[in-house]
Amino acid sequence: MGNEYVLETRDIRKVFPGVVALDGISLKFRPGAVHALMGENGAGKSTLMKILSGMYKPTEGVVLYKGVETEFNEPIESIRLGISMIHQELSPVPHRSVMENVWLGREPLIKGTPFVDHRKMRDDTKALLDDLELAIDPRIEMSKLTVAKMQMVEIAKAVSYNSEVVIMDEPTSSLTRSEVDHLFKIIRRLKDQGKAIIYISHKMDEIFSISDDVSVLRDGKYVGTYPAAELN
């Protein structure tokens, strides 16, 4: 890659009317590592992730992807570059199928036509879910799934982009213990593939179980970054 870090923020500042949400945040994310972001509510974690995923633009500062200064005008630009995000607030299309949710906006077309290739979409979704060991029917309507299963579909969707950076914002909030273990298995595999995982959680046991690096934010300011092994 020619650069030690796949993603960096330099002196990121984000100001909303009457509120400084982020003030001079500089972070570096390594490929093949899980980087946890810690901080109380209001620390600025979600705001920073929305900047990295193209939902917000920073007031000041820059984002670098593979050493190149980058600016996102909308989320699809960050996805195309190689950054995908699993949001804490799920936003599925409830009356569409699992496969339609996974490939929403990038549906495969029958060659030479404007028509969606439903068979390919179903087969690709099944292959993706099987690869992640998720027992979910690609054809089932999203509204018929449990919240936990919807969360796993969102995780599968993020993986389907084959992104270099995967942001997970409180991904276990609706998962059972066994589902958390399954998610951690997926995370470790992504890590082995050289992906950078940014992991946001309030659960200390999860952070120490899965993370390599831990950064702490407080009141929109950077406190420090530490090896997880030293904090545990």
Residue ranges and their predicted role:
Residues G2-N232:
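Glycine-rich phosphate-binding loops of nucleotide-dependent enzymes
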